[in-house]
């Protein structure tokens, strides 16, 4: 009976909300899987990092530490995306509660903010575009302007070299790979920047060819897996 009614009159607000919640839960599970695989790849990279330390292979240690730093930043973005999805889910349920009281759903600024943030994320863009159109038809969301669909800028491109060097240094220090740099060195920041430019060549040219325990193929495999998780 419910299906027949939906065919002639369209889905009820409650049916619409169940569909929206299902979409949100699906995306949250996708993010959970990405986080799981990202952690597994990062753990493997950390093991390889310690093995490189035993070989005193500073160049490749820095390359791998840079990949771990990127994985950490990507993991943070995934966590923030899941939190936004959770916020959107709560806001939509609040709309259903308001519907019972006032008999209608109203456009929400908070929902607009959450959808705007989520739609700019590459991994959620297509799903959130489709969801935003449904929310607009239901009157929960005002029509979004074109600039709201622009993708978020990649922090990998915006990151300053010195900041990236600092992250790499923190990772190496965390795993007791090399000692933290001396704060008394007046030219420490400049030296680190110059060192990193030399220590982080492309993987195709920068992997040590004479490594006995970890060869070029292993390091390329690690980086490929980390890059795949970020796509």
Curated annotation (Swiss-Prot):
One of its GO terms (cellular component) is mitotic spindle pole body attachment site. Keywords: Endosome, Membrane, Protein transport, Transport. It holds the Pfam family Snf7. PANTHER family: CHARGED MULTIVESICULAR BODY PROTEIN. Transmembrane segments: none annotated. GO terms for biological process: endosome transport via multivesicular body sorting pathway; late endosome to vacuole transport; mitotic nuclear membrane reassembly; protein transport; protein transport to vacuole involved in ubiquitin-dependent protein catabolic process via the multivesicular body sorting pathway. Class E VPS protein implicated in concentration and sorting of cargo proteins of the multivesicular body (MVB) for incorporation into intralumenal vesicles. The lumenal sequestrated membrane proteins will be targeted into the vacuole after fusion of the endosome with the vacuole. It is found in: Endosome membrane; Endomembrane system. This is Vacuolar protein sorting-associated protein 24. Component of the endosomal sorting required for transport complex III (ESCRT-III). It comes from the Eukaryota. It is a peripheral membrane protein. It comes from Schizosaccharomyces pombe (strain 972 / ATCC 24843) (Fission yeast). The keyword Aminoacyl-tRNA synthetase does not apply. Residues 184-214 are annotated as: Disordered.
């Amino acid at each position: 009976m419910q299906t027949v009614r939906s065919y002639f009159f369209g889905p009820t607000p409650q049916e619409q909300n169940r569909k929206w919640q299902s979409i949100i839960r699906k995306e949250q599970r996708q993010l959970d899987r990405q986080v799981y695989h990202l952690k597994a790849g990062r753990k493997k990279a950390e093991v390889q990092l310690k093995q490189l330390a035993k070989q005193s292979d500073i160049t490749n240690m820095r390359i791998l530490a840079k990949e771990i730093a990127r994985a950490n930043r990507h993991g943070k973005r995934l966590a923030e995306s899941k939190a936004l999805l959770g916020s959107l889910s709560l806001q939509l349920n609040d709309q259903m509660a308001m519907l019972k009281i006032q008999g209608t759903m109203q456009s929400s600024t908070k929902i607009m903010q959450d959808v705007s943030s989520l739609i700019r994320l590459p991994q959620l863009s297509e799903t959130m575009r489709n969801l935003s159109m449904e929310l607009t038809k239901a009157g929960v969301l005002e029509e979004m302007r074109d600039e709201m669909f622009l993708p978020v800028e990649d922090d990998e491109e915006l990151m300053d070299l010195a900041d990236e060097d600092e992250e790499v240094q923190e990772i190496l220090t965390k795993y007791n790979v090399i000692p933290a740099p001396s704060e008394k060195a007046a030219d420490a920041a400049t030296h680190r920047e110059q060192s990193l430019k030399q220590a982080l060549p492309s993987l195709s040219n920068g992997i040590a060819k004479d490594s006995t325990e970890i060869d070029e193929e292993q390091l390329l495999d690690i980086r490929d897996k980390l890059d795949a998780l970020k796509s």
